């Protein structure tokens, strides 16, 4: 930033022109980077206007400030704050110096804690300087072409060295373009796509101001530009001298479009080499003024033809055959001259690490502290005067509590030191051998569980006969179908058993009431038609005679079947008739039973039969099936 004697060289109305331009386009800030009067070939802060968010408003006037003056007042307050901090930093230790710092600091209406993020960005920008050809303003000044940068907060630091600051302040769009012998930079917190009408609007705002060249252009000599090589001289380009036609230029004001202007322009166009010689030696100041005006007028009326998504450099052409630019030298020659010029000027490094050092030094200046947590290891041995006292651990801090003088400072100190320790402790716990062992145990247990599950599925696949696939879903589906089929078969067998039991009980009841067969009736009638008491029995009453009591109350007592593995034991008692034993044995054979022991006896018209047999073949008859088949044979009359 131009301080002290340098700042007086900036025109007074430049800030007002910046204010009008920035307010017209509604951007956050505007900066004019001018050629340094103390360092050759360097661009530094010339002036600026802040139009962004304001965190705290402080005024030293009793009356209300108008809306259009708020931005100017805020910009002045930020400049005063930076100057006060700079003076405090540069002052040496001592009573006299301390009183000077106190007086200077009291003049500032703002303090660092009153600033918003965007104001911090604007304030820190005051400390930046750029070599010509380096940094965004330096490249713009060297090339004479505007640069439009979108996504400045995420840009590479090699492209935009203040990307870290832009990220903290949410500055997304930054535009630089050459103007008035320096570089105008504008920025906003919104994402604005490339539009050359914005630059045109800013330039038009300067041109529409009341005779800006009367005050701005003559002040160019105050910048000591005569002692510094012009960007066009450094790059080896031809001077951007507009070649006007015989018609007067339509954009120029009437006071400028005179015959003298045409004569001076022709002199510049025809004798360009002599112009450069005069400019280097310090002569022909009026020609320089005309040259600068022609350059700015041509930049105002021409727009860009090329654009890109993020960073673009626009190239202007002649409009309608009225303006034509001189030829440029080759790029190789320009680069060689740049390197030669850089040997004569003080270089500033803009690699990311040096940018961090520069940023930390600015923060150190503002906060007046060199604490290791804030500045990092680069400033460990800094011995700078600070308003903060260095905190040291006392004897009580070893027990976990720090001795503090104020509750707020104690809370802040505890947050700064304890919170990182908590996170570090959690990280160490996650990285500890116990945690790794526990994680490994979980993996082993999960592997074993999956192996057991696979074994169960393979066992189930072997049990279910209809399973042909090996995937788990198919095995489960086939198992469900098989169980449903078994359930249906059980229901069918139970219903069949109930119907068989009902039928058997009905058959036994009928047999008890059934009369003797015809042979027995005939023999009974032939033998004796009288009963034991001498009474004659009617033939019609013979059918009503009760059968002999067998001593069995039901089928459960007449048939017993026992199964012992592959062996079956059948115990049967039924009414004896001719051929009944043979029929029973045939039924047992049909049931795939191999009889190896048969015991039978008859008495009182009953057949008692005990058969020991074994299953033969793959077909196995259940006890229910055996019982049902024997009941159909044994109780048929």
From Swiss-Prot:
GO terms for molecular function: DNA binding; DNA-binding transcription factor activity; protein dimerization activity. One of its GO terms (cellular component) is nucleus. Induction: By nitrogen deficiency and UV light. Negatively regulated by MYB66/WER, GL3 and BHLH2 in the developing non-hair cells, and positively regulated by CPC and TRY in the developing hair cells. Keywords: Activator, Developmental protein, DNA-binding, Nucleus, Transcription, Transcription regulation. One of its GO terms (biological process) is epidermal cell fate specification. Disruption phenotype: Plants exhibit two-branched trichomes instead of three-branched trichomes. Its main location: nucleus. This is Transcription factor GLABRA 3. InterPro entries: bHLH-TF_ACT-like_plant (IPR054502), bHLH_dom (IPR011598), HLH_DNA-bd_sf (IPR036638), MYC/MYB_N (IPR025610). The keyword Transcription regulation applies. PROSITE patterns: BHLH. It is found in: Nucleus. Pfam families: bHLH-MYC_N, bHLH-TF_ACT-like_plant, HLH. It comes from the Eukaryota. The keyword Nucleus applies. Efficient DNA binding requires dimerization with another bHLH protein. Homodimer and heterodimer with BHLH2. Interacts directly with TTG1 and MYB0/GL1 to form a complex. Its interaction with TRY prevents MYB0/GL1 binding. Interacts with MYB75/PAP1, MYB90/PAP2, TT2, CPC, MYB23 and MYB66/WER. Interacts with MYB82. The gene is GL3. Residues 437-486 form the bHLH domain. Residues 541-637 are annotated as: Binding with MYB0/GL1 and MYB23. Residues 497-521 are annotated as: Disordered. Mostly expressed in roots and flowers. Also present in stems and leaves, and, to a lower extent, in hypocotyls. Expressed in epidermal root hair cells (trichoblasts) and moves to root hairless cells (atrichoblasts) by a cell-to-cell movement through plasmodesmata (at protein level). Transcription activator, when associated with MYB75/PAP1, MYB90/PAP2 or TT2. Involved in epidermal cell fate specification. Negatively regulates stomata formation, but, in association with TTG1 and MYB0/GL1, promotes trichome formation, branching and endoreplication. Also regulates trichome cell wall maturation. Together with MYB66/WER, promotes the formation of non-hair cells in root epidermis cells in the N position. Whereas together with CPC, promotes the formation of hair cells in root epidermis cells in the H position by inhibiting non-hair cell formation. PANTHER family: TRANSCRIPTION FACTOR GLABRA 3 (PTHR46266:SF6), TRANSCRIPTION FACTOR TT8 (PTHR46266).
